[in-house]
Amino acid sequence: GKIKIMYDSACHLSTLADALEIGRICDEYGFYWYEDPYKDGGVSIHGNKTLSQNLSTPILIGEHIRNPETSVDLIVNGASFFSRADPDYDGGITGSHKLVVASEGLGIDCEIHSCGPAMRQLMGASRNSNFYEVNLLHPNCSNPWSLPIYLNNYSDEINCIDNSGNVKVPNFP
């Protein structure tokens, strides 16, 4: 199969010009999305709309936004092609699900941020989410988000990904 490549700047790049330069590289290589491109904290409608209008790579804004209203504003104003929800920071599963449903109503995908049991449950209940983020993962070190506090051998280590590239949603506590 074909691998989709995404880039998450995590609002690290200093300027819109820097973000545009990196975005052009994302375009050249056919990236699936370009996430939180520069240090606006993910809230500049004008800056992110400018990027969206000048790049072919879709922009994903939302990792640093904590409410569905701001995310929807970014989407309807053409600043973000996707939304991003996180049950740890966005009002739990209920608050995050509100953004998932709002995004679905707008016809866009809502990607779930980070990993954990709540993220898997939210993604499993969402029609418009594509990728489970097993973040900060490398074959030679453990995932700092895979906490040893869960029952039934729950894990977000590399072995949680099956041979087909899927991650199961647990049906136990």
Task: Show the residue positions of the predicted features.
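Metal-dependent enolase-superfamily TIM-barrel catalytic cores that perform enediolate-based chemistry
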Residues: 1-50
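Short, intrinsically disordered, charge-balanced linker/junction segments flanking boundaries
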Residues: 165-173
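Shared catalytic-loop signature of beta/alpha-barrel
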Residues: 24, 30, 41-61, 65-166
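Short, well-ordered beta-to-alpha junction loops that form the rim of enzyme active sites
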Residues: 10, 114-115, 172
